[in-house]
Regions:
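Glycine-centered tight beta-turn/hairpin loop motif at sheet-sheet or coil-to-beta transitions
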Residues: 1, 60, 86-88
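Glycine-rich portal/gate segments that line the openings of hydrophobic small-molecule binding cavities
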Residues: 38-84, 103, 134-145
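Hydrophobic/basic alpha-helical segments enriched in Actinobacteria
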Residues: 5, 30, 61, 96, ...
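Hydrophobic/aromatic beta-strand elements that line small-molecule binding cavities or substrate pockets
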Residues: 6-8, 39, 64-71, 82, ...
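Beta-strand/loop substructures that line and gate deep hydrophobic ligand-binding cavities in soluble
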Residues: 81-134
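Hydrophobic ligand-binding cavity/cleft-lining segments
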Residues: 1-41
Length: 145
């Protein structure tokens, strides 16, 4: 499994940052690798809510991914898992208050599911550094607007 983690400081209060991040229908506002986010199950942002997004697959073609909220502890933490036929993504977002706003820690893991995956572990690690970098840059702007 490839993993990445980064921290972002924000002037937003923890509640405000949490509300912006858990709304997965807005993920395309901070991750340019994601399009067409929509909620497909549940109402609001509680455990079990599911969202479908489109990402660029390893073959360069659009690929749907369904994310489910596994844990929600407002305003401190939530966990989501995204799956499709090729991979499983596991993301943990924690938010800690600071004197000037909050610090968001984003921990992400990506595991290939196929018996004959399209990438070697080294290739996946290298690719995931780039994918996480795009998300980090987007989140830094999104949480500091």
């Amino acid at each position: 499994m490839a993993t990445q983690q980064f921290d972002i400081t924000s002037p937003l209060a923890p509640d405000a940052a949490f509300d912006r991040l858990i709304d997965l229908t807005r993920v395309n506002e901070w991750d340019r690798g994601v399009t067409n986010p929509r909620q497909i199950y549940g109402s609001g942002h509680e455990v079990g809510s599911r969202y479908e997004v489109t990402v660029v697959g390893f073959d360069g073609k659009p690929a749907p991914v369904v994310y489910e909220l596994l844990e929600v502890d407002r305003p401190a933490r939530f966990v989501m898992e995204g799956t499709n036929a090729v991979f499983c993504a596991h993301d943990v977002i924690t938010i800690e208050p600071t004197d000037t706003g909050c610090t968001v820690t984003y921990s992400a893991g990506l595991e290939l599911l196929e018996e004959d995956p399209p990438l070697s572990p080294a290739q996946l690690d290298s690719l995931f550094v780039k994918v996480a970098g795009v998300a980090e840059d987007g989140l830094r702007s999104y949480l500091n607007m």
